[in-house]
Every structure is written in C-alpha cells, then in structure tokens.
Amino acid sequence: MNQPSDLSHTSMSRVEAMHSWSAPNVPALPGRGPQLRLYDSADRQVRPVAPGATATMYVCGITPYDATHLGHAATYLTFDLVHRLWRDSGHDVHYVQNITDVDDPLFERAQRDGIGWRELGDRETELFREDMAALRVLPPRDYVAATEAIAEVVELVEKMLAAGAAYVVDDPQYPDVYFRADATVQFGYESGYDRDTMLALFAERGGDPDRPGKSDPLDALLWLAERPGEPSWPSPFGPGRPGWHVECAAIALSRIGTGLDIQGGGSDLIFPHHEFSAAHAECVTGERRFARHYVHAGMIGWDGHKMSKSRGNLVLVSQLRRDGVDPAAIRLGLFAGHYRDDRFWSPAVLDEALARLHRWRSATALAGAPDATDVVARVRRYLADDLDTPKALAALDGWATDALTYGGHDATAGTTVATAVDALLGIAL
C-alpha cells in the first residue's frame, strides 16, 4: 500500500475535530481465523481478500439527518464483521468512515424542522455514535466529517482540473465544477451497468443529468458554486462546497492512500456514488482500481418497501433501544439473513432473534456442555466464507440445542463459545 496522498498538505488548515465512539472489548481467540473471502461487486465473484499486515477499509458514513435506521445498522454491522474477522486472522486494521455533514437533504430537513443545519448534523451524528456503541460496533480509526476535509477536496479538484478530467461549466452565476465521466477508460467497471441504467440511477440518486452546460449528462458534480443561504468555503475556483462523491475520494486518499483493500457501503451506493468516487481517485493516482474489493450490503425493508428516509418507513435503532430491546438481538436479527441479500425486518424477525439470544445465553451458562472446538472452528470458517452468518448462527443453534437437551462434561465449553460469539459476532452472552 502506498502512503496517504499529499492531499492532506494544503494551504487550508485541516481540522481533526470529529471523534468516533468507545470501542468494545474484543476477546482474543486461540490461533488465527482463516483467510477472509468476500464477494467483489466489480468482479461479480467471491474471492480472497489479501491485505498486508495492516488491512485497510473505507466505508461511507451517514448523512446525519435521520439516524440510525436498521438499513444503516445492517451496513455497519456487515463491515464490523469484516473488521473482527481481520483482527481474528492477525491483521491490524485501518478503518476510515466519513460523515456527509454538508448536503442538500440535511439542509432541507433543517429548514423543515426550523433548526440550524450544523445543529441538526451534530445531534444526529451523536445519536449515530450512541447507536453504534450500543450495537458494539468497532469504531473507525479515522472518523471524518466532510466539513473537516474541505482542504483535501479542494486539492483533489484542482488536480482533476489540471489533468483535464474536470471542467467549469459556462455559467457566470453558478460556475460549478464537474468531473468528466469519460476521464478514465475503465469507468463503469465497478457497477457493470449500461449507459441507460447509469442515467436512470444517476437521476434517481442525487445526480443532475439535465444541468445546462454539462459536456455529458453523466458528468458528476465536484464543486457546487456558492448558492444563497447555503454554506460555502473558499477555493481557487470560487466559493462553494463539495459534491458528494469527491468527499469520499479525498478522505480515503488522504487517510489511507492508494491500494485500499475494501471500499464498502450499501448496495444503493454502487452507482453513482462508489463508481464516481473510485473514478475520481483513479484519474489522479493512475491506479487501475481504487479498491481491491468493492463490497456492498443488501437493503433492509419494512412494510413491503426498502427502508429509506425519503419514504419514511424507518425502524430506528434508538427507538428499539428505548423500547427495551437488547442491542444484541438487533445484531442477531440482522445477521439472520446473508449480508448481500435484500431482506425485511419484522416483529417475527425480532422475536426469533430474542429467542435465539435466550437459548445461547442459557446454553453457555451451563456448568457442563458439549465440547466447543468444532463449533468454534465452523463459525470461523462460515464467517470467513463471504460472511455466511446464517450458517454460523445455525452451527451455534445446533451446539446450544445439544447443550440444553443433553448437557455435557466440558466445564469450559460455555465460556469458549461465549468468547467466540463475542469476538467474531460482537454479541455478549
């Protein structure tokens, strides 16, 4: 892996004010877990993840105006598993996550609620941190707000302009800066979508294909020129604020550098967000791939639809916690399905998770239980095979059923299983 980019060295000061959340204790297991294999969205296949001594991962964070729904939780729990499995196999982990704390949806919600956008963002970010701590998610090493990375964004945009990969639209009032979608020959490799699909998703997911003055409807916003009533920062190309995709490229390059092991997020980020953030980085570094693996979690639904802020069909982690739901059951409920699958949350899913948690706690509390060596090995193996949580949970169910039905003579088995469940699945029994 190369060193972090010199994007961090600009004439604009960089403020490191954002903090993450307290890390849960992670017990160590004997030996080392097997090599992790994950589905790569770009290659459309499961293949080994082969980091160096330090594994690197960038996961896109929230836009803090309605945190934290179970769709968010499913994504961050997915990459928490990756983090834990890397640690179990002997790697140090450099995990970076951003917060998109300057964006149109945030401004719109703040205006609707009669609150300042910074106040809203700070409040929802703090709630997100509380939810992540309650869910026992391992925190990122670098937790970076977009507003803390303006200097890096400005320098990255300058490099793209100098390389001819970006241009300023001919608009005296709003001279926005755009990225040329054809700036890299490999553009489109991550999603594999055809142009019509790209255009449809671009319009649906925050793009502006009809913006006058663009060279191509797919060209993506890098720098939005200052608008009345909106925050802005100075730059060589005029006051304004960052586009969405360039924030992640700049933060990842400045904190980790090239050779990123995993870029991750929800499957709705494959295009345009991840496709463009990768292209932004690739066009200035010359790298063929921004990340060795592109990993995406499926969507969580409720009442027959994908859970989303725009639809308003949200099940919030904070509300479940206020209702007295054990956060360990939330983890188990989301782990009951495979991370790549779109799936639905329901009262039945929660009830099953609570019952499973009770069985596991009862089994691990027994004075004697069946030997745990095989079940721990199988859980490690299943999780290393593209995070197969359904098989891992089924293996633990089998051990717990045997323990509760037949007992056993191993006085340490319960502790062994509880330690493995804590270390690998993040669930305290």
UniProtKB/Swiss-Prot annotation:
Catalytic EC class: ligase
Stated name of the protein: L-cysteine:1D-myo-inositol 2-amino-2-deoxy-alpha-D-glucopyranoside ligase
Catalysis: reaction(s): 1D-myo-inositol 2-amino-2-deoxy-alpha-D-glucopyranoside + L-cysteine + ATP = 1D-myo-inositol 2-(L-cysteinylamino)-2-deoxy-alpha-D-glucopyranoside + AMP + diphosphate + H(+)
Presence of the UniProt keyword Metal-binding in the record: yes
Residues spanned by motif 'ERGGDP' region: 204-209
UniProt-listed Pfam families: tRNA-synt_1e
GO molecular function, one term: cysteine-tRNA ligase activity
Cofactor(s), by name: Zn(2+)
Domain of life of the source: Bacteria
GO cellular component term, pick one: cytosol
Motif ('KMSKS' region): 306-310
EC number(s) given by UniProt: 6.3.1.13
Quaternary structure, from the entry: Monomer.
GO BP terms in the entry: cysteinyl-tRNA aminoacylation; mycothiol biosynthetic process
Annotated keywords: ATP-binding, Ligase, Metal-binding, Nucleotide-binding, Zinc
Family note: Belongs to the class-I aminoacyl-tRNA synthetase family. MshC subfamily.
Cofactor remark: Binds 1 zinc ion per subunit.
